[in-house]
A protein has these predicted regions:
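Extracellular/virion structural assembly segments
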Residues: 1-226
Length: 226
């Protein structure tokens, strides 16, 4: 009408503020570890990808060529940052990733390893609940490193050397490369999960601003060779 108008505004950004790269101070084997806990308000989206090609020569028999001989896991984790300092630290970490370029270690945040007995300060063998690792364990990327989160907030990272049969059918033993230097009961661990070498699976990450100091982010990640 003569008193109501509707318009669509498009803004050009004349200049952007440079974001300083900020790498994680937690490292394992000289590679940063991303230990920020995800926002588990919904299930993690996960799918398995393989570098496979179907070879069909028209003779009636087809073959599959799996280049990597292993699956690559793609997961999408949600994160919630609740203040400006957390947001600034995340944006600095994101800049250090350079999209898909720079890899990092990331806990799977899955309860894959459940201890059942106390481990002593000098021991390198942990008794865990049976998950079939002794039977099906294969030293492949994503199953050779583990992350241990103690109830005091300290992270420990270890290389898994082997799995073996336990004293009962409900247990297995997991050998790690280094002892913890302290006694630990099963309830002393907040989380124990596999540690995967990972990279972002996108070059651009959308940051969803809820307010001027609260943002939500969904990070697609893809496992890589360690």
């Amino acid at each position: 009408s003569d008193a109501i108008a509707r318009a669509r505004l498009v803004f050009d950004i004349a200049g952007t503020t440079a974001i300083t790269k900020q790498e994680s101070t937690t490292t394992f084997n000289s590679t940063p570890v991303w230990i920020t806990r995800p926002n588990r308000v919904r299930d993690v989206d996960a799918d398995y990808q393989r570098l496979a090609e179907v070879l069909d020569f028209g003779t009636g028999i087809t073959a599959v060529d799996d280049h990597a001989a292993r699956p690559f896991v793609r997961r999408a984790f949600d994160y919630l940052f609740k203040n400006r300092s957390e947001i600034a630290a995340f944006r600095g970490w994101l800049a250090a990733r350079a999209g898909r370029l720079t890899a990092f270690w990331h806990p799977t945040w899955e309860a894959s390893i459940v201890p059942t007995k106390k481990i002593l300060s000098n021991q390198t063998v942990m008794t865990v609940a049976s998950r079939g690792y002794a039977l099906y364990f294969n030293p492949m990327p994503g199953r050779t490193e583990a992350a241990f989160l103690h109830k005091n907030g300290t992270w420990y990272f270890r290389t898994i050397q082997s799995f073996g049969a336990g004293t009962t059918g409900d247990e297995e033993v997991m050998a790690i490369n280094q002892s913890f230097g302290f006694d630990a009961n099963p309830e002393d661990w907040v989380a124990i999960c596999f540690l995967e070498k990972t990279r972002l699976d996108a070059d651009q990450i959308e940051i969803n601003w809820q307010t001027d100091s609260v943002v939500q982010v969904s990070l697609p990640m893809r496992s890589v060779k360690s």
